[in-house]
């Protein structure tokens, strides 16, 4: 899929293995993986950070192949899912950082332009998540209250 505010085509990606079964060398059971996911989530890690930690530290290549469910589904079933989706959260965090930069650097025109692009991405993504019912229909991004959302 192409980029929204850049000319790049975005065709580079990693190739997932065709076999959907866990590797034969992996001795970890599904229950142990779920326990590790819950433990890492209680520490405050995001779903993508949990996936990276499991891959790098515990040698679990794909959680979905081992457990049959994705990390986010496991977290939601345990009641530990994030209140707003991770990609929207990171965009809001970036917008707050740029807005803080704009307070001290008022003449920075490029940052002002980039902030407009970031906020348009936030509005578009929020509209998508409202239709998918992953955020409440009353959710509205407001730059004044955005810092409380990511705190």
UniProtKB/Swiss-Prot annotation:
Keyword Ribonucleoprotein in the entry? The reply is yes
- The answer to keyword Ribosomal protein applying to this record is yes
Q: Which Gene3D superfamilies match?
A: 4.10.860.130, S15/NS1, RNA-binding
Q: Which domain of life is it from?
A: Eukaryota
State the SUPFAM superfamilies in the record. Answer: S15/NS1 RNA-binding domain
* Biological process according to GO: translation
Q: Which InterPro entries match?
A: Ribosomal_uS15 (IPR000589), Ribosomal_uS15_arc_euk (IPR023029), Ribosomal_uS15_N (IPR012606), uS15_NS1_RNA-bd_sf (IPR009068)
Any one GO CC term of the record: cytosolic small ribosomal subunit
Annotated GO MF terms:
small ribosomal subunit rRNA binding; structural constituent of ribosome
> What would be one Pfam family of this protein?
Ribosomal_S13_N
Task: List keywords of the entry alphabetically.
Answer: Ribonucleoprotein, Ribosomal protein
Family membership, please give it.
Belongs to the universal ribosomal protein uS15 family.
Instruction: Give the protein name, as stated in the record.
Output: Small ribosomal subunit protein uS15
- Specify the taxonomic lineage: Eukaryota, Fungi, Dikarya, Basidiomycota, Agaricomycotina
């Amino acid at each position: 899929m192409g980029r929204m505010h850049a000319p790049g085509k975005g065709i580079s990606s990693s190739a997932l293995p065709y076999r959907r079964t866990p590797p034969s060398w992996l001795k970890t059971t599904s229950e142990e993986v779920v326990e590790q996911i819950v433990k890492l989530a209680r520490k405050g890690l995001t779903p993508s950070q949990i996936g990276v930690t499991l891959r790098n530290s515990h040698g679990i290549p794909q959680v979905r192949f081992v457990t049959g469910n994705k990390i986010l589904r496991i977290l939601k079933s345990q009641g530990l899912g994030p209140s707003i989706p991770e990609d929207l959260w990171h965009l809001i965090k970036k917008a707050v950082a740029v807005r803080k930069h704009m307070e001290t650097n008022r003449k920075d025109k490029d940052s002002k332009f980039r902030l407009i692009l970031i906020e348009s991405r936030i509005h578009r993504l929020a509209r998508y998540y409202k239709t998918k019912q992953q955020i409440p229909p009353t959710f509205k991004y407001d730059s004044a209250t955005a810092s409380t959302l990511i705190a």
